[in-house]
Amino acid sequence: MIDLKNVSYETNSRELFSDVNFVINAGDKIGLVGPNGAGKTTLLKIINGDIQPTSGDIISSGEEIGILPQNLNKWLDKTVYDFIEEVTGVKSAREEFDYQCERLTQEANEKTLLIYGEALERYEKFEVANFDTTIKKALSRATLGDIDPDRRLNTFSGGQRTRIALAAVFASRYDLILLDEPTNNLDDSGVILLEDFINNSPASFLIVSHDRHFLRNTAERIIELTGGKGVNKYNLGYDEYIEARRGARQAMTDRYKQYEKEKKRLYRVARDARIRANSAKASHKKSDSDKLNDNFRKERASSNIAGAAGGVESRLRQLDEPERVEDEIAIKFAFDEVSSKKHSLISVQSLSISHDREKIIGPVTFNVRPGDKILIQGENGSGKSSLLNFIMGNNTPEYHRGEIKKGENAKIIYMNQSQSLPLKDNSPLDNLRYLSPKLELHDAINILIRFGLDKRTISSTKAIDLSGGERAKVLLAAMSTNSPDLIILDEPTNNLDIPTIEALELALGQYKGGAVIVSHDQDFIKNIGITEKIKI
């Protein structure tokens, strides 16, 4: 059992989250959701021990915890074997065991024997002696059984590296496995393999994901991190969580409206009572001795009315204010009207591409007109990103055959799957104005706020320090202001939070230009009105 108690974290004098409390039990399959920038990845790193919380504690019963990476850029110079050995904890378990064996031969006592026993226990838990067999089975399960484990990661395509990351999950022996956006760039068959592994594994999983289909198929509980105080916990699957959340927010809204209504009523009663009391007090005339008794009665009535008013005011002060539902940023945007009315925006005819004399794509043929939404499908490593990059002129393959024709004066905007910004050391605001130079300063600020970026983040945070979802939002903001005739999107839902994905779905559904899209997000594909699917 892992118990988070009042965990808080601050960065650059900004509180990311506070008072986070929840328990992870053996075998739990938990989805961790929340808006971009709420601190989900940071929380995973805290649980894994990579960073320390500002306050609070992580209490465990000795469980082995590991975070499995989705992005392998840090390990590109390592071999497949070395990478998986490191991220699964096998390397550290082996090295510690070897060290304690050596130490025991030099200094045998009760203390060294105890430490040796702990190292041996970890060595056996991670099945270090059988790791060669483990990695072979894991690679085979990830449909990579024919690759050489001694080959370096930088020699594989992006799609193949995604599968290698999947194999690392299969090879892990942690009690709690932390996954951060594990379906990013993973093809449909890979997602199914991962879902099956999670559902049948005895390990606990804490999964950060915005893939609704994947969460629906894996998460038995949902924890919602909103970037404020505490978390919202739901012992429900994803669809049930959505309904329960909607109902809970509506109930909170109704309670607050009732509170406001009662508050206004009591205020009116107290105000009217005060007016009557003052009116009664002003009407008596002390100089008229003949009306002494009448004045006395009026003073007493005035006093009684004032007392009643005071009682109502006291009730008003004691009225408990219920928790107010925070307004959710409703991200709504549309792509500007297209400038081109041309019949064809881009035409790809019998295109084949190869590297190292090995054909990786083709032949591929498709034509994009205004209103078309073309989905490019294929397994990891099939060359989908290579195709898009070649269309955009971003790479030159060793060999290609076929033809690409772009519509004259057609404005094409491309978002690659890395979602990188051009000015890494500059703010989101600087990047948006660089990508959309015609934007006025106040318009650029308002657009970024509308896309859900924190006001402090907009001008003070470097692009390199943004979360993946925040970077993607800056790119989408730029795309929405540039009137593109053709949009080319490579895994656009990577890292985006669910409200932004839903806003993108709506915008694409209403978009009159052409779109070429690579995506494995099943809900997203279903909701954007794909007109043609191209399998490569």
What are these regions (language model features)?
Residues 93-104, 119, 259, 263-277, ...:
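Non-transmembrane amphipathic alpha-helical segments
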Residues 250-292, 298-305:
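ABC ATPase nucleotide-binding domains
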Residues 325-340:
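Short, flexible cytosolic linker that couples an ABC transmembrane/permease module to its adjacent nucleotide-binding
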Residues 112-123, 295, 309-319:
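Short amphipathic alpha-helical coiled-coil/interface segments
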Residues 124-125, 129-135, 301-313, 317:
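Alpha-helix-centered segments that form part of catalytic cores
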Residues 278-283, 318-328:
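Proline-centered turn/helix-capping motifs that create local helix->coil transitions or kinks
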Residues 98, 283-286, 327-331, 445, ...:
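Short coil/turn segments at secondary-structure boundaries
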Residues 1-256, 336-536:
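ABC ATP-binding cassette signature C-motif
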